[in-house]
From Swiss-Prot:
Transmembrane annotation, as ranges: 18-38, 53-73, 82-102, 106-126, 142-162, 164-184, 222-242, 252-272, 282-302, 309-329, 347-367, 372-392
Organism this protein belongs to: Bacillus subtilis (strain 168)
Biological classification of the source: Bacteria, Bacillati, Bacillota, Bacilli, Bacillales
Name of the protein this chain belongs to: Uncharacterized MFS-type transporter YdeR
CDD domains: MFS_NepI_like
GO CC field: plasma membrane
InterPro entries, alphabetized: MFS, MFS_dom, MFS_trans_sf
Pfam hit, one: MFS_1
Gene name tied to this protein: ydeR
Length: 395
């Protein structure tokens, strides 16, 4: 068999697992750095208030395009090369975002930042190839912990860096880090050349068939699309609540609040270990239930008192715990399928649930503007409840 498949099933070292987790966190953070800085960026590059949302939207569109059209390449071309080229593309786009002053050029660069960030989703199945069957859940869980930490840390880090050095600095710093990471990974990662005998057109054509004929993929994508929709809705609206007249949180205080979500990432490896022990179904039900509870708490107790703030902190931790665990359980289930199609399965899974997150964000902003915090929470609760009801039908 080819190089990469000989590697599969070997024991992955703790140091390589840590490197992959760190790399995933660094890469995926690029998708979120701009979110708390949209107001500052739009003024600097001359975008109207109505066009400011395109900064985040085009990054997301670029990422989804990469998930659908680039990540599947991991099934037919050498993985390390795909990872390094994607990182260098992202670094070039980040450099442009740091220095261009023209709105159209910035938005084009934002698209390519998203496109290049798919390197993280090539690394995750890559880690699963290197792990033995018995340890696959644990390894994927550890790598996903790094990815989730990147998501959770990105917003407070970009806010704090912008507060000190200006909004450009975070993109310039990330460009430098991306180049360094590309060099390190090119030296350290083992080669993996897939054995799939197909061309790119046939590869893309097979994805719709995979979605139709793989029930585990469909179920797991639907579960996590609703869960991630609730996650995105919460983290889109809670900064609006905290900066409003009831709480009067500063940008730094909101950044510190966002840091509490880090505690939730610790459940990712726990979820992986439970899956390795054959407890995927039980753990999935618990994870979905935790997400429902996390949104019920702030709905039942709404106050700007210390008790109310404590409830919001607990809600953030529980939400991130449930989402993190469900993500790892889902990827463990998907990566247990045929290894030669893992990149396509992962690309489809990520694209579907990321679309759910984008819908959650947009609905959250509308719900908060239309009916306030309670309306947003009720809609947010509906998402994991639907996922839980669908989960009950699983045989």
């Amino acid at each position: 068999m080819a190089n990469g498949n000989k590697q599969a099933g070997q024991r992955i070292s703790p140091s390589l697992t840590l490197l992959l987790a760190t790399a995933c966190g660094i890469i995926v953070a690029n998708l979120y750095y701009a979110q708390p800085l949209v107001g500052l960026i739009s003024k600097a590059i001359g975008l109207s208030p109505s066009g400011a949302g395109l900064i985040v939207t085009l990054t997301q569109i670029g990422y989804v395009a990469g998930l659908l059209f680039l990540v599947p390449l991991g099934d037919i071309i050498e993985n390390k090369k795909l990872i390094v080229v994607s990182l260098l593309l992202s670094a070039a786009a980040l450099t442009l975002t740091a220095f261009v002053k023209h709105g159209t050029l910035f938005l084009a660069a934002a698209f390519f930042v998203g496109l290049g960030s798919i390197a993280a989703q090539v690394l995750v199945p890559f880690a699963s190839y290197l792990a033995s069957d018995a340890a696959r859940g644990r390894v994927v869980g550890n790598v996903m912990s790094g990815l989730l930490l990147g998501i959770m840390l990105s917003r407070p880090i970009s806010s704090l860096v912008a507060d000190i050095w200006g909004w450009n600095a975070i993109f310039a710093l990330s460009a430098v880090v991306s180049v360094i990471l590309a060099i390190v990974l090119s030296k350290v990662l083992p080669a993996r050349k897939p054995t799939a005998n197909t061309n790119y057109t046939a590869l893309l054509g097979s994805m719709w068939k995979l979605l139709r004929t793989t029930p585990v993929l469909r179920r797991r994508a639907i579960y996590h699309a609703f869960v991630f929709g609730a996650f995105s809705l919460f983290w889109t609206t809670v900064p609006l609540l905290l900066s409003g007249p009831d709480f009067h949180f500063s940008q730094k205080a909101i950044a510190l609040y966002a840091l509490v979500g880090i505690a939730g990432a610790v459940t990712a490896p726990i979820g992986g270990r439970l899956a390795d022990r054959g407890l995927t179904r039980l753990a999935t039900g618990i994870a979905l239930g935790v997400v429902v509870v996390s949104l019920l708490l702030p709905l039942m107790i709404q106050s700007s008192s210390p008790v109310g703030i404590t409830v919001l902190v607990a809600a953030a931790i529980l939400l991130d715990m449930g989402v993190s665990a469900n993500l790892v359980l889902s990827q463990r289930a998907i990566f247990s399928l045929a290894p030669e199609i893992r990149s396509r399965l992962n690309g489809l899974f990520m694209a579907i649930f990321f679309l759910g997150g984008a819908i959650g964000s947009s609905i959250g902003g509308w719900a908060y503007a239309s009916g306030g915090w309670s309306t947003a929470l009720w809609i947010g609760i509906a998402f994991p409840v639907i996922a839980l009801l669908y989960f009950i039908t699983e045989k």
